[in-house]
Amino acid sequence: MQNMFSFLSNKKIIALFLIIGTIFMPLSSEAYPIFAQQNYASPREATGRIVCANCHLAKKPVDIEVPQAVLPDTVFEAVVKIPYDTQVQQVLGNGKKGPLNVGAVLILPEGFKLAPQDRIPEEMKSKISNLYFQPYNAANENILVIGPIPGDKNREIVFPILSPDPAKDKGTYFIKYPISVGANRGRGQVYPDGSKSNNTVYNASVSGTITDIIKEKKAYKISIETKDGTVVDTVPVGPELIVAKGDTVVTGQPITDNPNVGGFGQMDTEVVLQNPVRIKWLIAFLILSTLGQVFLVLKKKQFERVQIAESNF
């Protein structure tokens, strides 16, 4: 119960910071896990796609490394790798350029969860540093999220995972389990409400001739003359205009470049929850097999000596 209240308190604090940031700073469409948490009961759609792809439209690679097999009730590492060029900068919410952030969601089998601090080995703690992981929600301790965090120092994220013990955890078995990961680098192109961020390409809403372009503090106002009148398209600062006054455009034609340098990727892997009794039997079998081969060799040599001795007579 105490852990539950602690978890809820953490979520309230995060939500409070997000509200304050939304009021006093421009919405940045970063890798805030709370966006997915507030809009989706599960981070994975029925199609298998992770919902983060709804906001991060570009596809980028991601990799995950886990042990081939783990023993019950043990702590192991799940290493998520998010490769990208650290020299590249992204468009921030205010239109300026800045470093990329990263975020990730790790979907574990039921029963697997974030390892408690007192169970994490010191060597693993040094790899985790001060990173903060949290469950996707109170009902899904097996789904972990992190981000946004600075990407230049966190292109590899080590998740400390505690495996279940089938002897104590009902519904878990000594079998092979799937693990899924989704990770992004950089800001998203779409907000959860469907509106665009300033980290994507903008298109002309109508066909016509551009009669005026006014640059304001936070946006461009582009006047397009049509046969039915003038339509003004608003483009936030960030993407660069690729049209000029006097140009003719058609509906859907790009009027800016695509400033996005990031993207999202997902990957699946597997881990075996190994029964320690099977390992003991396997070791015993290997020992017996080895001893059997040794005895066979000794018996063969003994037989050869007897044969040689008989031949001498």
Swiss-Prot record:
Residue intervals passing through the bilayer: 279-298
**Positions bound to heme:** 32, 52, 55-56
* Residue stretches in coiled coil: none
Q: Which SUPFAM superfamilies match?
A: Cytochrome f subunit of the cytochrome b6f complex, transmembrane anchor, Cytochrome f, large domain, Rudiment single hybrid motif
Q: What is this protein called?
A: Cytochrome f
Cofactor section: heme
User: What organism does this protein naturally occur in?
Assistant: Mesostigma viride
Name the InterPro entries on file: Cyt-f_TM, Cyt_f, Cyt_f_lg_dom, Cyt_f_lg_dom_sf, Rudment_hybrid_motif
* Topological category with respect to the lipid bilayer: Single-pass membrane protein
Do the record's keywords include rRNA-binding? no
Q: Where in the cell is it found?
A: Plastid, Chloroplast thylakoid membrane
What's a single GO MF annotation on this record? heme binding
Gene encoding this chain?
petA
Q: Which GO terms describe its cellular component?
A: chloroplast thylakoid membrane
Instruction: Give the family per the record.
Output: Belongs to the cytochrome f family.
Predominant subcellular localization, coarse grouping: plastid
**Note accompanying the cofactor annotation:** Binds 1 heme group covalently.
- Assembly with partners or alone: The 4 large subunits of the cytochrome b6-f complex are cytochrome b6, subunit IV (17 kDa polypeptide, petD), cytochrome f and the Rieske protein, while the 4 small subunits are PetG, PetL, PetM and PetN. The complex functions as a dimer.
